[in-house]
């Protein structure tokens, strides 16, 4: 949402501390960083907000504050035949509405996970050269499933069926995990040639895991 007379500009203050060091003639690169971010005037949709054909969308959002913090680790290796890196991130992102009136609060005014709250994220990327023409590449990704709000019960009220939902973002979709593998073949390296060719045969999602994106 853009800032308007009814919606204040969003503000953020961030602090970070990092340590970086290389080893073995710079063939190994490492880093570690921690951070904390304080956010103000964040907005989120109220419960049962109307999102379609709504000319007064600003009336269905609530302002609040938030914070996020985390740790990032990274290592890269670059040697004669092996080149790759591995990273791991632990992070949390939470929100809370600032309204004084209980009816205006989301999640009863308690902290809740933002839509971007994914505590664990890990990536492994590597390439190994078996020869000047043949190499193998690996790409592995893992992340915690993002948070969602689910209906947990239903009841009858006034002759109609009603749905009771969980706390805001009280559940998560299944974790995401994927491995990609490829074999790369370079053309010959003759100096006098009009063009250079290369072939790559890859398998996306090697384990065939069904990774949900949205529920």
Language-model segments: which ranges?
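Outer-membrane beta-barrel translocator domains and adjoining extracellular loop/strand segments
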Residues: 1, 42-51, 56, 91, ...
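Outer-membrane beta-barrel signature, preferentially recognizing the C-terminal barrel domain
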Residues: 1-31, 36-38, 50-79, 115-119, ...
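Active-site rim elements
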Residues: 3-5, 110-113, 166-172, 188
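Outer-membrane beta-barrel channels and translocator barrels
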Residues: 12, 23-26, 78-82, 91, ...
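Residue-level detector of short, conserved catalytic/binding motifs and their immediate flanks
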Residues: 15, 71, 124, 181, ...
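Transmembrane beta-strands of outer-membrane beta-barrel proteins
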Residues: 18-20, 31-35, 87-89, 139-141, ...
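C-terminal beta-signal and adjacent terminal beta-strands/loops
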Residues: 39-40, 133, 141-160, 174-180, ...
């Amino acid at each position: 949402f853009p800032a308007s007379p009814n919606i204040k500009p969003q503000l953020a203050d961030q602090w970070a501390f990092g340590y970086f060091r290389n080893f073995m003639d710079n063939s190994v690169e490492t880093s570690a960083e921690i951070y904390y971010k304080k956010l103000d005037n964040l907005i989120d949709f109220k419960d049962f907000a109307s999102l379609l054909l709504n000319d007064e969308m600003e009336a269905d959002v609530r302002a609040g504050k938030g914070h996020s913090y985390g740790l990032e680790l990274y290592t890269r290796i670059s040697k004669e035949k092996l080149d790759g890196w591995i990273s791991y991130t632990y992070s949390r992102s939470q929100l809370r509405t600032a309204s004084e009136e209980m009816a205006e609060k989301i999640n009863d005014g308690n902290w809740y996970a933002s839509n971007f709250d994914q505590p664990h994220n890990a990536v492994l990327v590597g390439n190994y050269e078996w020869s000047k023409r043949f190499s193998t590449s690996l790409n592995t990704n893992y992340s915690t499933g993002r948070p969602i709000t689910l209906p947990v019960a239903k009841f009858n009220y006034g002759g109609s069926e009603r749905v009771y939902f969980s706390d805001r973002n009280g559940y998560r979709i299944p974790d995401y995990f994927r491995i990609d593998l490829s074999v790369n073949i370079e053309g010959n390296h003759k100096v006098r040639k009009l063009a250079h060719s290369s072939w790559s045969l890859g398998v996306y999602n090697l384990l065939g895991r069904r990774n949900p994106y949205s529920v």
